[in-house]
Design a protein with these regions (language model features):
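Extracellular glycan-modifying ectodomains
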Residues: 1-339
Length: 339
């Protein structure tokens, strides 16, 4: 079955045969779900450019040699890192060996707004991701509560400032910022000023690795500047297209957002890539937890024991924290209901 990058290479080759390549400079953007925002931002900044996006999100039949030959016809090639297996013959490192001038794009990863988010990579299935209501993104609190046999109501009671504080969720920001800036620096970009601006404007991530569109636009501008290309003055909000938001949105919890002067929510958005057919689905906290529990109930405990669960399970204090905060919150709710 052909993947997105297979189709794109066939499209580009067909267009070249017909002599329909127009625009300069010729720019190629290679990468995952973040690549559309980068490519779109570059087109806004250099409207006369010819820009193609080569999406690498699924395994295809294209060989690395064919990809490199296709990309070799462009004036500038920008690429996010990708692992071997998506393209036959290698990954990012092998592509660099064939195309030494390929410019790296930093992967936008930031956990400061989403310290509770984890992946569940099933160790019994070679690390295959367990999908829940929000795709591969899961709540560590919800998963641990399930593993301890808590009810949905008890789990809802856990979500609040006391447990977040005890788990260190308010202490993640600085490490996340440093890791993000280190990734950018590895691509010869200084995005420190951009990070400050994004942080002041509000939560700038839909999940820990899905940035909002204006973030990718700013990264696109930084990449073009690094490449020595002149960009046009443009207000992104006048032309904003956000491809990533069609996927899941893992909310920034209110208690976490408020720490940084913003407003959060417990509204979980499910993915919907067919907007012409339906509007989509959102879950409140209760529905999200119930949906997650229904998924976890179909798996063996060993399939759900990701590193954070192993660490928490090995620490008796974490179990006591969960039991205490669930009971305390439920007691306070009951007392308030009697008033």
């Amino acid at each position: 079955m052909l993947s997105e990058i297979d189709h794109q290479i066939l499209h580009v080759l067909g267009r070249r045969l017909l002599g329909r390549d127009k625009g300069a400079p010729r720019i190629a953007v290679v990468g995952n779900c973040q690549s559309f925002g980068i490519a779109y931002g570059m087109k806004l900044l250099i409207p006369q450019a010819h820009i193609d996006r080569f999406t690498i999100v699924r395994k295809g039949v294209t060989t690395l040699d064919r990809l490199a030959k296709t990309l070799g016809r462009y004036d500038h090639v920008f690429s996010l890192e990708f692992q071997p297996g998506f393209v036959r013959g290698g990954g990012w490192e092998e592509l660099k060996a064939l195309l030494p001038d390929v410019a790296p794009i930093p992967s936008i990863v930031f956990s400061g707004f989403h310290p509770d988010t984890i992946y569940i990579l099933d160790p019994t299935r070679g690390g295959y991701p367990v999908e829940g209501p929000t795709g591969p993104y899961h709540s560590a609190i919800a998963l641990y509560a399930f593993l301890r046999g808590m009810s949905v109501e008890q789990t809802i009671a856990l979500f609040g400032e006391p447990l977040f504080e005890a788990l260190g969720y308010f202490d993640v920001w600085q490490d996340s910022a440093r890791e993000f800036l280190d990734l950018a620096a590895a691509s010869d970009l200084d995005l420190s000023a951009e990070l400050v601006r994004w942080s002041r404007s509000g939560p700038f991530m839909y999940s820990m690795n899905h940035p909002k569109a204006h973030v990718l636009f700013d990264v696109a501008k930084a990449l073009l500047t690094r490449a020595g290309l002149n960009t046009a003055p443009v207000e992104f909000s006048d032309f904003a297209v956000d491809d990533i938001v069609r996927g899941v949105v893992f909310p920034v919890y209110p208690e976490i957002a408020e720490r940084y002067g913003h407003r959060g929510s417990y509204l979980f958005k499910r993915s919907n890539y067919r907007l012409s057919r339906n509007i989509g689905q959102f879950d409140d906290l209760a529905a999200y937890i119930a949906g997650s529990f229904a998924v976890y109930a179909k798996h063996q405990r060993a399939q759900l024991m990701v590193p954070r669960m192993i660490d928490w399970d090995a620490n008796p204090e974490v179990g006591r924290l969960f039991a205490f905060h669930a009971a305390d919150a439920l007691t306070r709710r009951y007392a308030a209901a009697q008033v």
